Structure formats: structure tokens, C-alpha cells
From Swiss-Prot:
CDD domains the record matches: Trans_IPPS
Known function: Supplies decaprenyl diphosphate, the precursor for the side chain of the isoprenoid quinones ubiquinone-10.
Protein name: Decaprenyl-diphosphate synthase subunit 2
Family: Belongs to the FPP/GGPP synthase family.
The entry's keywords: Isoprene biosynthesis, Mitochondrion, Transferase, Ubiquinone biosynthesis
């Protein structure tokens, strides 16, 4: 499920040609279409995605400079750079910010707040991937460098949160970091000790997209009803993505059970969108959910 976000967002005109190369209904084609929706729907949304990509590239260049182009840095950041979910959370934020908007079109100032929130989600996601890929087999230098890089990205996310000047969003997104750490510890514990498997999955895979979507709605001053719908869409989408990536069981009964659960998650995500107006952003979110179960 590799997804050429970074190169694509610097050249929005390439969307059509890339789509022609992708299998219709595939994960990559669905996400490419979603980017296209944002590009058509508003020049500002398209610009925000492009700016975010350039800023992440610039951040990587900064870290390279500080570490004297340490060759270990490439190894440390490789899991993030190769991640199929790179820039996925910012895309969710921008789609949900469009789907949940109430009343007049957003101002330029509000678009900038969308960008800050999108950047926060990507910084947290990048830091988490770098941290969870730290292994005992790595050298002390690798471990120290990976820890520092991940911590630096979390620090940058904290600064962006402060600039949003929204206490509710600061608390929610800070709790995402705590959720990811708690989920990581839970996954390392055995059997009945520690967290249940369901709770661990929620912490590791579902709360990040759920709370990112919720915060996009909060920026729009949406009603609690809309806020709940945004949260539920992100939660069930996260759960379905985690289950879809689970290794296929050789047991037919287990496989059927997992498929049934996956379909339920996808249907729950889609039903959450029923409260939104029928616009392209909503349709893009619907297609993203549908693509998970294919």
C-alpha cells in the first residue's frame, strides 16, 4: 500500500496521470482521489497539503544538519519514510475539516489552523513510528539518536499545539501521545497481564485518527452531534485499518470472524458520515472506509 504523497503533493497536476496508473478501487487510487477532491474543492486545502510536505522535508534537512549527516539517520527514519500511512492523518484532518464545516466558507486564518492541526498529527505519527521501531538489537548510538529525533518531533508538535490556542484541542492531542505510549507498553505485556487486546488496539490504532477528526470538527465550532460523528468515523476507520493489516489466519473460522468484524467496523465508520452534507469531501471519506474491506 505504498503511497507517493510527498512527490504528489509538490506536483498536484500529477494526480490525474497517477490515477490512470492505479487499479480503480485500490488503496492508493482512493487516497489519490481524496487529494484530488481537496485540490478541486479549495485552493487553500491543496496549498496546505503541499506546504505540509515541504515543511516535513525541511525538518528532515534540519535534523541531518544537526547530526552532521549521520548515516544512521536514514536507518532511523526509514520506517516512517516507507510507511503506507505517511501523511494519511493530515489528509483525514483536511477532509474532515471540509466535511464538518458549518455555515460560511472558512477564512484564511481558519485554513492556517487546519494546517497546524494537520502538521501536529503528522509529527506525532512520525515520532511514534520512530520510537516503536527502536529495538534491543540496535547500537547505543542508534537508540540514542532515534530517541532524540522522536522526542524532537514531539516537541515540535507541542509548539504547534500551543499556537492553536485551543485548550480542548491541546488536551485531546496531548492525550493521543499518552495513548500511543500506553498502547506500546500494553502490546509488550503478556496475556492477561496489563491491557486487553481490544484496549491496546484502540490506543495504538484508533484514538489517533479519531481524535484528529474530532479536533478538525472542534476547529469548525461544530455541534456535539457532529463532533461525535467525526470521532466515531476516525475510531472505526482506525480499527478497520488495524484489522485489515492483521496477518491472515489459516483457521477458516477465525478468518471469517475477522472478516465479519472488519465489515462491522467499516459500516460503523460509514454510518457516522450520515450527518454530513453530500459533498465531495464526505464521498472521499466514504470511499476511504470502503477501500479498507476490499
Amino acid at each position: 500500500m505504498s503511497f507517493p504523497f510527498a512527490s504528489l503533493l509538490k506536483r498536484p497536476s500529477a494526480i490525474s496521470s497517477l490515477l490512470s496508473l492505479k487499479k480503480p478501487g485500490s488503496w492508493s487510487s482512493i487516497l489519490l482521489k481524496a487529494v484530488g477532491v481537496l485540490s478541486r474543492d479549495s485552493r487553500w486545502h491543496s496549498d496546505l497539503l503541499k506546504m505540509l510536505t515541504e515543511e516535513m522535508d525541511s525538518l528532515n534537512g534540519q535534523i541531518n544538519t544537526w547530526t552532521d549527516n549521520n548515516p544512521l539517520l536514514d536507518e532511523i527514519t526509514k520506517p516512517y519514510r516507507k510507511s503506507s500511512t505517511r501523511f494519511f492523518h493530515p489528509l483525514l484532518v483536511l477532509l474532515m475539516s471540509r466535511a464538518s464545516v458549518n455555515g460560511d466558507p472558512p477564512s484564511q486564518q481558519l485554513f492556517q489552523r487546519y494546517k497546524q492541526l494537520a502538521r501536529v498529527t503528522e509529527l506525532i505519527h512520525a515520532a511514534n513510528i520512530i520510537h516503536i521501531n527502536i529495538g534491543e538489537e540496535q547500537s547505543n548510538e542508534q537508540i540514542k539518536l532515534a530517541t532524540l529525533v522522536g522526542d524532537y518531533l514531539l516537541g515540535k508538535a507541542s509548539v504547534d499545539l500551543a499556537h492553536l490556542e485551543n485548550n480542548a484541542i491541546t488536551e485531546i492531542m496531548a492525550s493521543v501521545i499518552a495513548n500511543l505510549v500506553e498502547g506500546h507498553f500494553g502490546s509488550r505485556q503478556n496475556g492477561s497481564v496489563g491491557l486487553s487486546n481490544e484496549r491496546t488496539i484502540l490506543l495504538q490504532s484508533a484514538f489517533m485518527p479519531a481524535k484528529a477528526c474530532l479536533c478538525a470538527s472542534i476547529l469548525n465550532n461544530s455541534s456535539q452531534y457532529i463532533n461525535d460523528a467525526c470521532f466515531n468515523y476516525g475510531k472505526f476507520l482506525g480499527l478497520s485499518l488495524q484489522l485489515a493489516h492483521k496477518p491472515v489466519s489459516p483457521d477458516a473460522q477465525v478468518l471469517q470472524k475477522n472478516n465479519d468484524i472488519l465489515k462491522t467496523y467499516v459500516e460503523n465508520a460509514k454510518s457516522s458520515l450520515s450527518v454530513f452534507p453530500d459533498i465531495e469531501a464526505k464521498q472521499a471519506l466514504m470511499e476511504i472506509a470502503n477501500s479498507v474491506s476490499k
